[in-house]
């Protein structure tokens, strides 16, 4: 059997395992949809400032004022990708490592590359599904427009999903055990989500500058561009994608250097 066929079979196996794990599926798909329903209902018919700041009188300065859900739907879609490709993947890999599953896999004929490709491929499939589901819910319930630039949106989701998968693998060596994994994942993602303006315009220059260091901010911006909430030329923003690529390369370097197949207790 070719390496490609083995990799595809591993993707299918990972997808089956994902959907059988109801908690992981609910967390990956349920959280973004739940927050979309809550915030989308509360702020429906209101507007927000995109790519600008809010002035003293509440006006949008240096940006565009758009309906709130036109902004919030792509933001929640981005969060769904981060959840499936970073949070769920990281916690799952650490659990497998602590349970000894990764060590046992190394002793089987299954190539390591096939296992990793299966994990990444399954996460990317889930990411595309959660983005599509979020877009459908936003359109049907809140009349948010469909992605204005479908191809850039798909490319952005796949690129960012791969980047966050790699970053997730990169931090697993620094998580001591499976019990600590959820806390570490939430600590490294949730605060950045808030200061990156996923829920509302975070009108603070200091926090905005901090957010721009991390890929979460740039992914949100690229999704806003692809969905049409931000003006662009064809739905692409080279700066956003370049920062994501840089983080992907850094994550890959750390993964290749430090990734462990065995628990420290082994």
Residue ranges of each PLM-predicted region?
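Aromatic- and glycine-rich beta-strand/loop motifs that create alpha-glucan
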Residues: 1-31, 265
């Amino acid at each position: 059997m070719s390496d490609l066929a083995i990799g595809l079979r591993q993707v299918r196996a990972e997808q089956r395992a994902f959907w059988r794990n109801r908690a992981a599926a609910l967390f990956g798909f349920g959280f973004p949809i739940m927050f979309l329903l809550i915030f989308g209902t509360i702020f429906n018919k209101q507007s927000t400032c995109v790519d600008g700041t809010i002035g003293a009188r509440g006006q949008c300065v240096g940006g565009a004022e758009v309906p709130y859900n036109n902004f919030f739907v792509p933001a929640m879609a981005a969060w769904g990708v981060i959840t499936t490709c970073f949070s769920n993947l990281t916690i799952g890999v650490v659990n497998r490592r602590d349970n000894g599953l990764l060590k046992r896999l190394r002793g089987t004929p299954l190539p390591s590359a096939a296992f990793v490709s299966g994990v990444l491929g399954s996460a990317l499939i889930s990411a595309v599904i959660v983005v599509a589901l979020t877009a459908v819910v936003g359109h049907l319930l809140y009349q948010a427009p469909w992605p204005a630039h479908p191809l850039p949106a798909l490319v952005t989701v796949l690129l960012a999903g791969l980047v966050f998968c790699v970053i997730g693998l990169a931090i697993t060596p620094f998580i001591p055990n499976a019990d600590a994994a959820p806390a570490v994942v939430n600590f490294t993602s949730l605060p950045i989500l808030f200061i990156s303006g996923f829920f509302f315009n975070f009108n603070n220059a200091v926090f905005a500058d901090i957010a721009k260091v991390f890929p979460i901010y740039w992914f949100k911006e690229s999704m806003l561009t692809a969905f049409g909430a931000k003006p662009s030329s064809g739905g692409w923003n080279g700066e956003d994608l370049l920062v994501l690529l840089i983080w992907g390369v850094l994550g890959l370097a750390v993964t290749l250097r430090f990734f462990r197949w065995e628990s420290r207790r082994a």
